[in-house]
């Protein structure tokens, strides 16, 4: 499944040419708009015109966690605050949170990326998708929310918690796809069984899981418990959020199909 087929099926040579063009543009843009990067790139002796191939990325000084914290909250923003329409932040469990600002254009690109990984996982505009990530400063819930809406799916923004009500919505709305952490998806399944809810009442066929690791054993439990096909996706607040990558293992049909 594709959302933007012309991009997702691009020839390798064309993709690398596009990546090089955008790498050079990004370096030049950061140099001109973020004083921190002006200084850092000057010290490294690197500029956009010196980048001749993708392998030259090794000459670009990395941005560290310390850099993000030292420039908290808005020191690395490349656009004026009046253009920011949303701000997200990491949890900051080991220090100051990583703060990310989004322009309208950023949000549009972000939703494109999420729509791509959702489509690659098998989501379509016919799906009813229940989001059981917690909404808030965390990028996961709103990231998947807007990407799935762009794909054309019907989104149920249930959030996390109140599991019994979430199960009621899932059954009554005919939810076909679930966005959650793997552990919460498993907990929901166990709760449904404890409440003696017939699993045949549920129409789940796809799981879009993330925000934590998932062992093969846990994945198997979720797939067998719900009768869905479980996929994982990856993201980080420093790079918008979910949509960076989607992991899909083409191993077998869904357990719902008798695999």
Which residues does each PLM region occupy?
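Single conserved hydrophobic/aromatic residue that forms the stacking wall/gate
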Residues: 250-259
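Phosphate/pyrophosphate-binding loops at sites that engage ATP/ADP/AMP, CoA/4′-phosphopantetheine
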Residues: 192-199
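Nucleotide 5′-phosphate-binding alpha/beta core
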Residues: 1-89, 94-112, 119-120
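Residue-level signal for inorganic ion chemistry
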Residues: 30, 178, 235
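AMP-binding/adenylate-forming
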Residues: 100, 104-117, 128-187
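Gly/Ser/Thr-rich phosphate-binding loop
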Residues: 199-248
């Amino acid at each position: 499944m594709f959302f933007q087929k012309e991009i997702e099926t691009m020839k390798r040579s064309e993709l690398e040419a596009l990546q090089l063009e955008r790498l050079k543009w990004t370096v030049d843009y950061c140099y001109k708009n973020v004083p921190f990067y002006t200084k850092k790139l000057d010290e490294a002796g690197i500029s956009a015109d010196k980048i001749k191939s993708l392998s030259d990325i090794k000459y670009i000084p990395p941005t560290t966690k310390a850099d993000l914290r030292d420039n908290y909250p808005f020191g690395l923003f490349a656009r004026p605050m009046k253009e920011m329409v949303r701000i997200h932040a990491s949890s900051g469990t080991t220090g100051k949170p990583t703060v990310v600002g989004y322009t309208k254009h950023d949000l549009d690109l972000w939703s494109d990326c999420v729509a791509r990984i959702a489509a690659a996982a098998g989501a379509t505009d016919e799906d009813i998708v229940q989001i059981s990530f917690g909404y808030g400063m965390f990028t996961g819930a709103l990231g998947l929310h807007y990407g799935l809406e762009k794909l054309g799916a019907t989104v149920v923004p249930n959030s996390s918690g109140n599991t019994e009500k979430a199960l009621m919505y899932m059954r009554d709305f005919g939810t076909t796809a679930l966005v959650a952490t793997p552990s919460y998806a498993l907990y929901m399944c166990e709760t449904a069984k404890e409440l003696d809810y017939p699993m045949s009442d549920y129409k789940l066929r796809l799981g879009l899981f993330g925000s934590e690791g998932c062992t093969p054993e846990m994945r198997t439990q979720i797939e067998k418990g719900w009768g869905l096909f479980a996929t994982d996706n990856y993201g980080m607040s420093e790079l918008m959020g979910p949509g960076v990558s989607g992991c899909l293992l083409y191993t077998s049909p869904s357990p719902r199909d008798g695999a």
